[in-house]
Each structure stands twice: as C-alpha cells, then as structure tokens.
C-alpha cells in the first residue's frame, strides 16, 4: 500500500483522480492476489504464479465485458462469487480478483485526497480503544435528557453511490466501470447482506465494506450541516477523514474520532448540547432539550434520508429514549442513567452552606444472562449454567487449551471492566475455569481432582495464574463497587456487541 502511495505522488493521473489507467497495472493485481488469498482457506495452494492469471489483454477484455453488459444480462460477474474457488481459475474467481484491485485503487486514491488536509492540522493524538466511547458517555451523556437511537438506512440505489464518487473521480471511464459494477452489487445493502458485512468480517468482501463506509461517510458529512442549521450555529466546524484509522482531534466545539476495528468504524462528535456516537449501523445522538426539539431532529433526519438518498426510512429505525426512564443496549452493555443526589458543603467564613445537586449517574451493566446463553451456544456450559467439557478442543495440546480459556476469560473481564455488576462476572470465570478442567480431564481420561492435583499440572499455575492477577485487579472484591475502570487496550468488541436480540 505504501508503494502505491509513493507511486501516486509521482504521477499526476492519480493525484488528479484519473484512475482508469491504473486498472491495468500488474503490480496492483499482485496486491489484490495477496488479499484474495488471505480470504481463502489455508488448504489452498499459495505457490500459484500471478503471471499465470493476470495480463493486460485479459484484464482489458474483462473490463470491456463488464461495461457492455446490462441488467438483463445473466453473466453476473460479481454476483454470488465464491471466494474459495480460486483453484478452479473460473470467471468468478478472476472477476473477484479484478474487484479486489479496483477496491485497492479506490481506497488509496481516497486516502491521498484527504492526506493534504490532515497534514495541515496539528495536535493529532492516536487512541485505539473502543472504551473511549464509554468514557465519553460517562462524562457527557448524564447532562442530556434524551437519546435518539438511530439505525442507518441500508437500502440505497447504486446511482447515489455513483453521484458520491463523481465528486472525487474525474474520468468518465472509471465512473462507467463503477456504475456497471455497482448495479451488479445492487443487492449488497439488503438486510441479510448487511448483517453479513457487519458481523462476520471473514465472510465479507472488501469492496462491500468500502461502499458501506463511503455511504456512511456521506450520511455523516451532511448530518453535521443539518445539526448546524438546526441549532443555528455558525461556529461548528467539521473535518472527516475516512482513510485515517486512529486519531482524535478537537476542533473548537466538535470532536471527531474515527476508529477502525476489524471492519467497522467508530465516530464521536461533540457539541455543547449534542453528543453523537456511532458503531457500525447503530448511532446514538444525546440531546439536552425538550421532547419537541428531539422530535424535530428526527423529522429532519427523515427528510434528509428521503430527499437526498431517495429512500424511505422506517420510523422504528429512529427511537427516542428518555434517559431517566429507560435503559438501552449498546456495544454489549445495558446502559442506564439513574438520578442521584449529591450533597455539597461549602465553607464561607463562618457560614456553612449545604446544597443538594441532582445529577444522572451512568450505569453500564454486563448482560450476564446473554453471556451465559453465549457460553451455552459455544458448548462451555449447558442450558442450566453447569460447566461442561469442550470436546472440540480435546485434540489440542494442554498449553493451547489453557491459553484459549485464559484468553477468553481475560478478554471478557477486560471488556466489561467498567460495569457496575462486577461480582456477577466471577460466576462466568468459574464456568470457564471448571470447563477448562473438565476439558483436560476428558482429554486425559481422568477426573477433575486428578488433573488439578497431578504433579506438574499447570491448570492453576499457568492459566489464571498469579502473574496475571493484575488483569483482574479491577474486579477485586475489596474494591469499592463505585469505582469504575475502563481498560484502554480493547481493540475488538465482545461478540455480544453485534447481537441486537437481547434476552433480558
């Protein structure tokens, strides 16, 4: 990728967004070939030469065929492509590789377009943790009284995306090629494919993610101007950089924080009376105002999606929640805001003033029942919560079994480090520890007691060891339940964060 950026700095065609000549560079498809093999299974041969598959005439013929086909054509070059059929050297695998090359061109080109804007700004700071969302919500959301829970609409016409790309792609051949491919992918934003794109990244195509990120970037860029008009503010500044993955920047009254974790993005936007958070297709807008103002904001959002993107958004995709009366599910946590009274004593000379301050307290709750159902689904325990052996892991070595259980317990405790029901997580730790012991006992055809007491056994000396007790120090029962620690090394979310159906 760096090589192509250096190449783009030397050639005016890339800098001026004339991308069509770049489609025929063989080194570009070498990168696409590597990306393609990364998505394939490990059992496939990797020693295949790129020269046996790519050449200028072949790519040119394929692109010409893409441009000449119409919607009634049954060729379907980019439809129902199986990424695991590379060895067959058929038309679908070839088209998939060409699509990977096209995606690389678009990503690098868009990155170079915003590079000059980023270099002109100072004070950027890298923050990679997903828990920065919860720290912002803990600090700022209690001052709001309403939250709009928004699901970004995913039904979009290909011509809307073509209009978006036309702003930074200047040559007509590239736009015609994109239009042909997008019409082949016109079902990519259906409900089923969207869930596949957001939940299991290994089954997702790179091009589909690029389309989704471009579409959401377009939505959010207009959302800022919409909020600016709604609050009659002229001091609101906005800068968006879809190619940057880790940074945090304050611009007067606004904070923008995009983070790419796996295949998703996180955006934080701060305004004196508005706080905006997004992960994937789920967005939260916290407002301080009356119920009428919140309904007006939702009305403007509906009009924006209807008139700009030419789509109708279902009313249930924008829910208005009153923070003091309801809790909601976001990123694997149940979030609630409860009223609390703070007693403030002020000493002024001989007078002692006592006043009560009523404020909202941020209470994130770990969904213990949902975690138990997840462990049941993964065969760590039965439906009643009793630990069972993980039979599929009995063919692994003892070290691998211990490391897997230890890693899962550590990640789970890290992710829910800021929840208020920390004591309930010890039950989850007990299930994982006993399931690990039963798995080792099943492997060695022994009992749990013998596995634990066997000389040289590393069940309680390596896994969950004292050397790693600092991992769970924030969950010590001697600590106050009011103390909340958010770990700053969370780079991927808990699997429950992608689940929208929660068992309460």
Curated annotation (Swiss-Prot):
Q: A Gene Ontology molecular-function term?
A: RNA binding
Coiled coil location? none
A Pfam entry, by short name:
MatK_N
GO biological process: what's one of them? tRNA processing
Gene name? matK
Which InterPro entries does the record match to this protein? Domain_X, Maturase_MatK, Maturase_MatK_N
Q: Where, per UniProt, does this protein localize?
A: Plastid, Chloroplast
Keywords noted in UniProt: Chloroplast, mRNA processing, Plastid, RNA-binding, tRNA processing
Briefly, what is this protein's role? Usually encoded in the trnK tRNA gene intron. Probably assists in splicing its own and other chloroplast group II introns.
Record carries keyword Acetylation: no
This chain's source organism reads Taxus baccata (English yew)
The record's similarity note reads: Belongs to the intron maturase 2 family. MatK subfamily.
Principal place of residence: plastid
The cellular component terms of Gene Ontology attached to this UniProt record, alphabetical and capped at eight, are:
chloroplast
Recorded hits in HAMAP family, A to Z, give:
MatK
Protein name as annotated: Maturase K
